[in-house]
């Protein structure tokens, strides 16, 4: 998984040199935001279950047909609802991984690269997940720098789905 810091070190090492001043400044910049990112990851992790449940309910309210149509891809049964909550929880988990890594690398590697194909294969609407992520962004309970850090990755996921 690539992060700005690992890329800088890899580039410098492949060129047989020490990190440049701008590369070190970027690394120190990441270290300054690391505390806020870790606080955000802890906060999201602690509330992941309730956020996923609430986000699923927000999807059901905006798109009521998701609970009315039968089929494996809809939430008309308890099993379907559980799968919806599980999938939304996966997005929350990816966001926490990004917060810890300090980059979109985890989301790029494990989610975004195959997202369109997965949604197409299972006939899932990206708009459902966009709605869920908007709910999470509005209700995560984070504030200050932790909220800014979390929101940047939530926005990245929303843009990847749009």
Swiss-Prot record:
Function recorded in the entry: Light-harvesting photosynthetic bile pigment-protein from the phycobiliprotein complex (phycobilisome, PBS). Phycocyanin is the major phycobiliprotein in the PBS rod.
Lineage, broadest ranks: Bacteria, Bacillati, Cyanobacteriota, Cyanophyceae, Pseudanabaenales
One Pfam family cited in the UniProt record for this chain: Phycobilisome
Protein name: C-phycocyanin-2 alpha subunit
Post-translational changes noted in the entry: Contains one covalently linked bilin chromophore.
Keywords: Antenna complex, Bile pigment, Chromophore, Electron transport, Membrane, Photosynthesis, Phycobilisome, Thylakoid, Transport
Gene Ontology biological process: photosynthesis
Annotated GO CC locations: phycobilisome; plasma membrane-derived thylakoid membrane
Membrane topology: Peripheral membrane protein
Complex formation: Heterodimer of an alpha and a beta subunit, which further assembles into trimers and the trimers into hexamers.
InterPro entries in the record: Globin-like_sf, Phycobilisome_asu/bsu, Phycobilisome_asu/bsu_sf, Phycocyanin_a
Cellular compartment(s): Cellular thylakoid membrane
Family matches, as Gene3D superfamilies: Phycocyanins (1.10.490.20)
């Amino acid at each position: 998984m690539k992060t700005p810091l690992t890329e800088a070190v890899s580039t410098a090492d492949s060129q047989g040199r020490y990190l440049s001043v701008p590369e070190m400044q970027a690394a120190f910049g990441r270290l300054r935001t690391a505390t806020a990112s870790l606080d955000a990851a802890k906060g999201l992790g602690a509330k992941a279950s309730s956020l996923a449940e609430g986000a699923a309910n927000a999807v059901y309210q905006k798109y009521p047909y998701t609970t009315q149509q039968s089929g494996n891809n809809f939430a008309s049964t308890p099993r379907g609802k559980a799968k919806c909550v599980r999938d939304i929880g996966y997005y929350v988990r990816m966001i926490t991984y990004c917060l810890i890594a300090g980059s979109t690398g985890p989301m790029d590697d494990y989610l975004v690269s195959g997202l369109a194909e997965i949604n197409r294969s299972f006939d899932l609407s990206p708009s459902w997940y966009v709605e869920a992520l908007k709910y999470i962004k509005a209700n995560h309970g984070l504030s200050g720098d932790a909220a800014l850090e979390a929101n940047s990755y939530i926005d990245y996921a929303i843009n990847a789905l749009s």
